[in-house]
Amino acid sequence: MSCATTIYTNLDNVMLGIMTTKEQVGYYDAAVKVKVILVSLVTSLGTVLLPRASYYVEMEMKGEFRRISAKALNFVMLVALPLMIFFMLFAEQSIRFLTGGTLYESATLPMQIIMPTLLFIGITNVLGIQILVPLGREKTVLVSEIAGAVTDLILNAILIPQYGASGAAI
């Protein structure tokens, strides 16, 4: 799984670097760095709860497994939604604050476009890591990651030449 995830997460930058300018890569990278920090907050609980979820599956404690999974999804919603909305609404101010000026102002739109992935990554992390892996469905997770990488490749090939960093963010 980690190989597919690594390819999937680095594909945008590689394709952007091949198809556009260094400036576009820089703008995209600024938006992605903010997203990566926020994703670590959103997905942190899933990592912590994985051993407990696996234990509940092993002990056939379905009610507890459902309860802990629901709590993890609620946590993702509670954390990801406000962060996503905040950084979409205040993307320009956030970029200025984090970069110390207006040099990366063109990262604003890519940042706004990329922010919904906080919610999507959070939900898929709970569904994949917390629910499917303890249930022995690693292959399903791998197939979904490969499908995501192929979709990303196709969308990047279509959107990056015309939209640059914003196309990579979609």
Regions found by a protein language model. Name each.
Residues 1, 5, 9, 32, ...:
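Short runs within selected transmembrane alpha-helices of multi-pass transporters and secretion channels
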Residues 6-37, 55-56, 92-103, 162:
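Helix-terminus/linker motif at the lipid-water interface of multi-pass membrane proteins
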Residues 15, 49, 53, 90, ...:
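Hydrophobic side-chain positions within alpha-helical transmembrane segments
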Residues 17-18, 66, 79, 96, ...:
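A cross-family signal for key residues in well-ordered alpha-helices
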Residues 22-24, 70, 87-123:
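Interfacial segments at transmembrane-helix termini and the short loops linking adjacent helices
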Residues 23, 34, 62-71, 75, ...:
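Juxtamembrane/transmembrane-helix boundary motifs in multi-pass membrane proteins
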Residues 31, 35-74, 80, 128-134:
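Helix-loop junctions and terminal segments of transmembrane helices
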Residues 32, 68, 72-88, 103, ...:
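Short alpha-helical transmembrane segments in multi-pass integral membrane proteins
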